[in-house]
Amino acid sequence: MLLTGLLCGILLGFVMQRGRFCITGAFRDMYVTKNNKMFIALLLAITVQSIGFFLLKEIGVLNVDPAENFAFLAVIIGAFVFGLGIVLAGGCATGTWYRAAEGLVGSWVALFNYMLLSAIMRTGPLGEFNKTLRNINIEQRNIYDTFGISPWWLVALLTFVTAFYVYKHLSKPSVKVAALKPKKTGLAHLLFEKRWHPFFSAVLIGLIALAAWPLSVATGREFGLGITGPSANIMQFLVTGDGKFINWGVFLVLGIFIGSFIGAKASNEFRVRVPDATTILRSGLGGILMGIGATLAGGCSIGNGLVETAFFSWQGWVSLPLMILGTWVAAYFTIIRPQRLKLAKAS
């Protein structure tokens, strides 16, 4: 059953790579370019998973309550720090995995540091610090339990909001994007050459995230998609050789790398690219902040931003805006401010 994690990861990695589904870009673009398309796509993926998750619970296929007590201080600090990190690293947790598979050396550095710090924050020197902050919590887990309502009210609200923004975006006049003459035909063109619409990718990602639940639960791991814990587990296994660290999630992230590599190679997008020293250092720092932040927050942009939000945990919906805020702050200092200084000098 663990191999289903590998299959799920291959599908997810392939879809994210080919769809250029970047959560860092979704957060950053809302501020830098005032473009909400990728964030709407994220909402669509959350909605698809949320509807399916509660349907599976309703019919008895899933019998899990994955939400934990709300560690508010750790979530607030961690989500913000993670948001800073993903801008410096040039991609979120999953984005860093799939960009590493495309041959970006900066992403290799970010990924290594992300995995290392995630492990250090769990069982290493920073383990007690993480545990202390995570233990400052309140016994509130899900938003619908706190307010004593059915989760279906929140599902309906999320569906309405998402449908409104999807419709609003699709109603805008389409802008033709210049493209080279296709070299492939048929299925090969659709899979490896044609530009995928973010909403199409989002629906596929939502369905993969939904499928992850019963597949993962069947192995004893009561959660869906998750990147930070499995990434830390790989590092811990490599250091200790202890097989207890190998679970469904580890196969998932390895599959993401494989699927992304397949997508990049087949579409001629794989190329080893070595950035300058400044970018390497920035990517390394970004990976460190990602590992610390995601562990404190209890999840990354996938675990918290895509999955925890789908079952309406406080952790998910508090971490999401904090990750966005961290992204915007980092974008200001790395993109907006340098541009303004350059314009001021030119004038």
Question: At which residue positions do the language-model features occur?
Answer:
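Membrane-interfacial helix-loop segments of redox and metal-homeostasis proteins
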Residues: 1-347
